[in-house]
């Protein structure tokens, strides 16, 4: 038997994958430019996250962002990286970031046809204790022929062209959803490229894990309380669901995608509109889930059907395996008619 080569000489990198998909779709190449630029930003953030302690990037930068979270030094760095790389891709016209109060309109000489909404460093409250954090993004096509403005970003999630997230965990993974489904890429630090490791990812029809912050249990809606009780104490004496909650949306949603189950950040008495942001947290994750065969809902409607009125709008979110989300919806509807 012939010896195997020391490494694969025909690897499918993310750059190659995106170029092939663009060619199949007869595209202009702008999406390829955009995603390649985003990839560069993710690689740079990954490096910064891993050497944060040495580079004194831990700690607070001394301000709060528009949604009231304390801004960490890494947040500022990550936001600048993503913002600068997207502007220089010549593929974007409007950029919405969790860290900026207003939408950023790209300079006329650098404009392209895409609108990008992103959270540069999700879960950053976990930075100091080395818990996995990530970057989330959603890409829309500009619909109007008018001068670019904030209203170009106020599109429902159904209009997303592509969405994804990067997870900075034991390895750096980039999950991308688009016309060809959901695909996962792992960063190979030896060659500095994202390598395709999972093609056409699908979520399990039903899982056995639930994920939510039970610290807010006293403020839960009755429907949420009943659903969680049912998972802990199944009426048919079947095995109870396991509970897993990191507190970093990217980490919790990624685990849900890989193992199946349900992730919940529902509305409660203190946060009647939910806590997670629609444009750059809920919509991209809902898009990925639906492309992987899962579901994503507020309880009242599909996440992707919400027409936003504000770039920092919040929404409740329940997403995951279709059977699990459907079971939650049945309980939710039962309580809604009471």
UniProtKB/Swiss-Prot annotation:
Binding site for Mg(2+) 2: 98, 119, 121
Requisite cofactors: Mg(2+)
Record entry for activity regulation: Subject to complex allosteric regulation. The enzyme can assume an active R-state, or an inactive T-state. Intermediate conformations may exist. AMP acts as an allosteric inhibitor. AMP binding affects the turnover of bound substrate and not the affinity for substrate. Fructose 2,6-bisphosphate acts as a competitive inhibitor. Fructose 2,6-bisphosphate and AMP have synergistic effects.
Binding residues annotated for Mg(2+) 3, in chain numbering: 119, 122, 281
Keywords: Acetylation, Allosteric enzyme, Carbohydrate metabolism, Gluconeogenesis, Hydrolase, Magnesium, Metal-binding, Phosphoprotein
One example of a Gene Ontology biological process annotation: cellular response to xenobiotic stimulus
EC number(s) given by UniProt: 3.1.3.11
A matching Pfam family: FBPase
UniProt function note: Catalyzes the hydrolysis of fructose 1,6-bisphosphate to fructose 6-phosphate in the presence of divalent cations, acting as a rate-limiting enzyme in gluconeogenesis. Plays a role in regulating glucose sensing and insulin secretion of pancreatic beta-cells. Appears to modulate glycerol gluconeogenesis in liver. Important regulator of appetite and adiposity; increased expression of the protein in liver after nutrient excess increases circulating satiety hormones and reduces appetite-stimulating neuropeptides and thus seems to provide a feedback mechanism to limit weight gain.
Protein name: Fructose-1,6-bisphosphatase 1
Taxonomic path: Eukaryota, Metazoa, Chordata, Craniata, Vertebrata
């Amino acid at each position: 038997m012939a010896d195997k080569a020391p490494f694969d000489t025909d690897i499918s990198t993310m750059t190659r994958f995106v170029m092939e998909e663009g060619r199949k779709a007869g595209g202009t190449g702008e999406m390829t430019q955009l995603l390649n630029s985003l990839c560069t930003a993710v690689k740079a953030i990954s490096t910064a996250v891993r050497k944060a302690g040495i580079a004194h990037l831990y700690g607070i930068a001394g301000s709060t962002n528009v949604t009231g979270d304390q801004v960490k030094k890494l947040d500022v760095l990550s936001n600048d990286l993503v913002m600068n790389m997207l502007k220089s891709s010549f593929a974007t016209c409007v950029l919405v970031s969790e860290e900026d109060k207003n939408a950023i309109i790209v300079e006329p000489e650098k404009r392209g046809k895409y609108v990008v909404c992103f959270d540069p460093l999700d879960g950053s409250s976990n930075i100091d204790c080395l818990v996995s954090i990530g970057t989330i993004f959603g890409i829309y096509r500009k619909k109007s022929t008018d001068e670019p403005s904030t209203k170009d970003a106020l599109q429902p999630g159904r209009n997303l062209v592509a969405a994804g997230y990067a997870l900075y965990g034991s390895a750096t993974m980039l999950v991308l959803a688009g016309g060809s489904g959901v695909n996962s890429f792992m960063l190979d630090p030896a060659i500095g490229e994202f390598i395709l490791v999972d093609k056409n990812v699908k979520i399990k029809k039903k899982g056995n894990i639930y994920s939510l912050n039970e610290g807010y249990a006293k403020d839960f809606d009755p429907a949420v309380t009943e659903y969680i009780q049912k998972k802990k104490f199944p009426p048919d004496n079947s095995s109870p669901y396991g509970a897993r909650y990191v507190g970093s949306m990217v980490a919790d949603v990624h685990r849900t995608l890989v193992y199946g189950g349900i992730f919940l950040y529902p509305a409660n008495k203190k946060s009647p509109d939910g806590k997670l942001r629609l444009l750059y947290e809920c919509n991209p994750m809902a898009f990925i889930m639906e492309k992987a065969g899962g579901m994503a809902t507020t309880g009242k409607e599909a996440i992707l059907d919400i027409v936003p009125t504000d770039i920092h709008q919040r929404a409740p979110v329940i997403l995951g395996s279709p059977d699990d989300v459907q079971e939650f919806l049945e309980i939710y509807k039962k309580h809604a008619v009471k």
